[in-house]
């Protein structure tokens, strides 16, 4: 046993210090990034935000809607091959280039992902997702996927420390997914005591990944557009959003009605709700590590997407970054004990 004395920070414990700017308008900010990935050699350009691979967020409808904003969607792994075929048949190449195919690490997952990728060469992203990316089996699966799909861009996670980022990149991952426990419907930190404050995880993992020519995606912990800006400021190449995109028409959650008002269910993928839906229930040897919440219906996701992108542009203008790429170089974090004036929050 040992204790690390270094202070670790989350998004709510910092603000970004404003700096002199020559920008005249938020419209002057370029949010599009251009990437060439380490292992796949593929090039991609777009806004580096990803809708999370949750079945109440990462749906085909969400992918179609967010593609118009140049935003990626990690489509959840529970669609059948036949459903994928129908989606591909009805989608343009522009939509497909904004889609990630999500998978677990079982042999059945591998075979299903292979069938999906074979449906259309425009599917260039694979998202290998497990709750605990520290297992040897997971690393071996990433290496197996890289060997099987040498030209596909592989995103793999989740981890929160630099040495594991390095191992995954060396095993074939182009992008490492960073975050354990920060999600709005994740209870891993409560059930297990395991986790890492998200901003510090992003800063440390970005440093490790960039040293090897890899990239990271900050996954979880964002509740406002300002948090998205902080993640990019901390060095994230991509930011994945779940709760901020939940509850919309495209989100796919079940709608329930209480006292004449309609709500949409949103739950973590390790929650009892998710396990009952997809594997018949919670196995006797494990605990659920997610919760289910009821969200008021939020309408089309396009309004939320515009709000997020608008906040991100505004953050860039406050620090003088004319491009999103420059934001991390222009970011100085200050530690704070309050974020906002909350006097009217309950009204």
Swiss-Prot record:
Annotated Gene Ontology MF terms? GMP reductase activity; metal ion binding
Protein family per UniProt:
Belongs to the IMPDH/GMPR family. GuaC type 1 subfamily.
Superkingdom assignment: Bacteria
Q: What's its job?
A: Catalyzes the irreversible NADPH-dependent deamination of GMP to IMP. It functions in the conversion of nucleobase, nucleoside and nucleotide derivatives of G to A nucleotides, and in maintaining the intracellular balance of A and G nucleotides.
* HAMAP family cross-referenced by the UniProt entry: GMP_reduct_type1 (MF_00596)
What NCBIfam families does its record include?
Answer: GMP_reduct_1, PRK05096.1
Q: Which InterPro entries match?
A: Aldolase_TIM, GMP_reductase, GMPR, IMP_DH/GMP_Rdtase_CS, IMP_DH_GMPRt
Q: Which GO terms describe its biological process?
A: purine nucleotide metabolic process
Q: Which organism is it from?
A: Shigella dysenteriae serotype 1 (strain Sd197)
Class of this enzyme: oxidoreductase
Q: Name one Pfam family in it.
A: IMPDH
Q: Which positions does UniProt annotate for NADP(+) binding?
A: 108-131, 216-239
What intrachain disulfides are recorded? none
Q: What's its EC? A: 1.7.1.7
Provide this UniProt record's keywords sorted from A to Z.
Answer: Metal-binding, NADP, Oxidoreductase, Potassium
Q: Which reaction does it catalyse?
A: IMP + NH4(+) + NADP(+) = GMP + NADPH + 2 H(+)
Report the SMART domains cross-referenced here: IMPDH
Positions of the catalytic residues: 186
Q: What is the name of the gene encoding this protein? A: guaC
How this chain assembles, per its entry, is: Homotetramer.
The name under which this protein is listed is: GMP reductase
Q: What GO cellular component entries does it have?
A: cytosol; GMP reductase complex
Q: Which Gene3D superfamilies match?
A: Aldolase class I
